[in-house]
Amino acid sequence: MIRLSVDDGCASDIRIAAIAEKYEIPTVFYWPVEWQSLAYDMGYNPLTYDEACYIANRHEIGSHTITHRHLTNLHDDVAEREIMESKFMLENLFDVKITKFCPPRGYTSPALSTFTHQIYESQRLTRGRGLVHIHPDSGANNNMPWREFYKIQKEQYEDIELWGHSHEFDRFEMWDEIEEFFQKELGTHGKT
């Protein structure tokens, strides 16, 4: 089974939502509470609140902290607050249950992971069994092109989670490649 997750709350997440719906891909959008501030700081356009609500009504939302700071660079009490309070803030913003968490850049520690699992049902990192970063040359994929890394993961694991950032899909002009990939892998199962 292929799943998809997208981080950060870029305006192009709306395109990912459309692809996920077209091919019936279970998708989680991991957003920091302050996704708009993050986008402006990083130089890309954020989702509007209305766009975020549209996605939240159709797909699962996961927490990506409040401010998108690297948790391992923070004091434990500050990191724990980012983990815990982001859940409640996102639940209030979108009136949905938040059960999944993704630490920014996958940076966590054993103690923070234990804390996270007391609050959330699951935590997605950037590396691990069946995880593939949709990126032209990612360290998370052992610096392999993502489609090659996907083939290796697919041989080893039944469940694959493709993850990425829609602002990177914009920057690296990956949209046609992504659409082609899902058409090839899921075209007979997805909506036409």
Feature-to-residue mapping (PLM):
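C-terminal active-site subregion of NodB/CE4 polysaccharide deacetylases
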Residues: 1-18, 22, 84, 92-93, ...
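Metal-dependent polysaccharide deacetylase catalytic core of the NodB/CE4 family, i.e.
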Residues: 21-112, 118, 129-134, 157-169
